[in-house]
A protein has these predicted regions:
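Conserved catalytic-core segment of nucleotide-activated headgroup transferases in glycan assembly
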Residues: 11-26, 36, 173-176, 183-253
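Conserved acidic donor-binding segment of nucleotide-sugar-dependent glycosyltransferases
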Residues: 303-314, 322-328
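C-terminal alpha-helical cap of glycosyltransferases
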Residues: 347-368
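A short, well-ordered alpha-helix in the C-terminal region of glycosyltransferases
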Residues: 322, 329-344, 350-353
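Acceptor-binding helix/loop patch of EC 2.4 sugar-transfer enzymes
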Residues: 40-53, 107-137, 186, 263
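Nucleotide-sugar-dependent
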Residues: 200, 241-284, 290-301
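Membrane-proximal helix-turn-helix segments that form the acceptor-binding/catalytic region
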Residues: 65-77, 91-110, 115-118, 127-147
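Carbohydrate-associated surface elements
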Residues: 153, 171
């Protein structure tokens, strides 16, 4: 079976890397050839959220659109189209319409985020909103033979639109994401890896970190915030740009993972639609973490066994103080988290689910 995977972003984006690219090998072992075609190339993605690069980005979007039109020629050799969120970052779902209506190809839509919630980009504002087609996700859900969903919240929304759904959480290869054998000397490292859009969640607990620093020594390591410098008065901070080659190493450098989510900062449904992937990454590395129990983050792992939940600033402070003062507890929770991920979130099991969904979509279309 030949499957054409259409993604918005290149491999540097977690959605493409972990929802498509990492399945190429496992699907091949199951008799399915997955060809991934991103809309943006790596350079355009790197410049996408830099305001000074707006002219370059607009030109790159035009070039990407023309390149995507060429991908239509591949549809005649394709058994199933697998769309990760959307085939193009702007405009109506033209490519998907051609695939389903003109080429009559079965489509599997993969949603790992609440893209059906209206969202205004802090970088592009009204311009970005004008280029977006916010009914696109609903259209794609209705056209898809199957919708693979990153969590239950997304699945419930897709079902409300009449979709057949399959839940496939975003996972990592636990042979790659492994615990670091020996921790370095020095202060305990609190860690967070994210993007410019999720950085406000971390910023919301800066007052907690400042209070914590008055009584405990630690270092706050921030990766991917989208800012050159991050200053938290009274707190030792290491601020790094995200780098694909360094991703696993960055996670391994943490002693405690932070996973704050504040639904009040964006639309509540947008926060609830987050896949909880960071929790899986923390557990795979074998470290304890503290998470706001929102959306999938409330469902993944076992609170009190693999991690702790915190909603208020007081709860964040209490749990951080507990973990900072008890190395044995950190080790126990981290080991439990590692076991949990290996047993319940293996790449092989998710590859089986995806292969079944692709074959089911193909068979259903042939039967109809």
């Amino acid at each position: 079976m030949n499957v054409l995977g259409l993604s918005s972003y290149p491999v540097e984006a977690a959605a493409t890397r972990y929802r498509l690219e990492q399945f190429v090998g496992p699907l091949a072992d199951r008799g399915i050839t997955l060809t991934v075609r991103p809309f943006l190339d790596s350079k355009a993605f790197e410049m996408l959220y830099q305001r000074h690069a707006l002219p370059y980005t607009l030109l790159a979007l035009v070039k990407s659109g023309l390149r995507r039109l060429k991908d239509v020629l591949l549809l005649s050799q394709t058994d199933v189209v697998l769309v990760q969120r959307e085939a193009m970052l702007f405009g109506p779902p033209l490519i998907e319409w051609l695939a389903v209506r003109v080429f009559k190809r079965p489509m599997v839509l993969d949603l790992d985020d609440a893209t059906y919630v209206s969202y205004t980009s802090p970088t592009y504002g009204r311009l970005g909103k004008a280029l977006k087609w916010f009914s696109k996700t609903d259209d794609l859900i209705q056209w898809a033979d199957i919708v693979t969903c990153g969590n239950h919240a997304i699945a419930e929304y897709a079902k409300s639109k009449g979709a057949t759904t399959r839940i496939i959480p975003t996972v990592v290869d636990t042979d790659v994401f492994v615990p670091k054998p020996h921790k370095s000397d020095g202060p305990v490292v609190l860690g967070w890896i994210g993007t410019h859009s999720t950085f406000p969640y971390l910023r919301a607990i800066f007052p907690v970190l400042q209070d914590l620093a008055k009584t405990h020594r630690f270092k706050m390591k921030i990766v991917g915030a989208g800012t050159d410098q991050t200053n938290i008065p009274g707190v030792e901070v290491e601020n790094l740009e995200w780098n694909l080659k360094r991703e696993v190493e960055d996670f391994q450098s943490f002693d405690i993972g932070l996973y704050p989510i504040d639904p009040s900062l964006y639309a509540e449904n947008w926060a609830a639609g987050k896949s909880g992937f960071k929790a899986i990454q923390y557990m795979a590395i074998g470290i304890p973490y503290i998470a706001a129990p929102v959306g999938a983050a409330a469902e993944i792992g076992e609170a009190g066994v693999t991690h702790f939940h915190a909603t208020t600033n007081h709860e964040w402070l209490q749990t951080l103080e507990l973990l900072l003062s008890d190395p044995a507890l950190r080790q126990t929770l981290g080991a439990a988290g590692r076991r949990h991920v290996v047993e319940r979130y293996s790449l092989s099991a998710q590859a089986d689910k995806l292969a079944r969904a692709l074959r089911e979509a193909s068979c259903d279309r042939k039967a109809s």
